Amino acid sequence: MERAIFAGGCFWCMVQPFEELDGIESVLSGYTGGHVENPTYKEVCSKTTGHTEAVEIIFNPEKISYANLVELYWAQTDPTDAFGQFEDRGDNYRPVIFYENEEQRQIAQKSKDKLQASGRFDRPIVTSIEPADTFYPAEDYHQAFYRTNPARYALSSARRHAFLEENWH
């Protein structure tokens, strides 16, 4: 098994697209990239921990490639917005591909370059590509939020879904 970590705004919205794929062992919502150990949601939302909301994906590379995961990642985000995603603003919601090793870094960078060259967006692709750091799972009530709180999930993800439909589908 291998690990991928992606940040794309609110972690609630980043779980379902990956969780439904063959070859995915698990998708956890959590926090990474900050300077506080074991942060809470409240602490991360206070924007004092340096953490970004992200998802940790454990996958079987014999069934799905990291490159495929990166391509799906792009289609869940606005890669031209470095200051958050959709209705969620601030560094704790910034888009980041966190890489585990040099191979993942190269795959992510090549994919980013290809997206920029495609002309799909008229603004620069600003999603950051950074080395993975300690990943702290979020509190239980955040896990699989789209299943446990479907009405609130639908409300919180409406702008995201409209953007994705217009720009990726």
From Swiss-Prot:
EC number of the protein = 1.8.4.11
The yes or no answer to whether the keyword tRNA processing is present is no
Question: What Gene Ontology molecular-function terms does this entry list?
Answer: L-methionine:thioredoxin-disulfide S-oxidoreductase activity; peptide-methionine (S)-S-oxide reductase activity
Give the reactions, separated by semicolons, that this protein catalyses: L-methionyl-[protein] + [thioredoxin]-disulfide + H2O = L-methionyl-(S)-S-oxide-[protein] + [thioredoxin]-dithiol; [thioredoxin]-disulfide + L-methionine + H2O = L-methionine (S)-S-oxide + [thioredoxin]-dithiol
Check the record and name the InterPro entries matching this protein.
Met_Sox_Rdtase_MsrA_dom, Met_Sox_Rdtase_MsrA_sf
Record-annotated active site: C10
Alphabetized Gene3D superfamilies for the sequence: Peptide methionine sulphoxide reductase MsrA
Answer yes or no on keyword Oxidoreductase.
Answer: yes
Keyword entries, A-Z: Oxidoreductase
Question: Which biological processes are named by the entry's GO terms?
Answer: protein modification process
- Domain of life, per UniProt, equals Bacteria
Q: Which cysteines are joined by disulfide bonds?
A: none
Q: Which NCBIfam families match?
A: msrA
What biological function has been recorded for the protein in this entry?
Answer: Has an important function as a repair enzyme for proteins that have been inactivated by oxidation. Catalyzes the reversible oxidation-reduction of methionine sulfoxide in proteins to methionine.
Q: What family is this?
A: Belongs to the MsrA Met sulfoxide reductase family.
Q: Identify this protein by name.
A: Peptide methionine sulfoxide reductase MsrA
Organism of origin: Streptococcus agalactiae serotype III (strain NEM316)
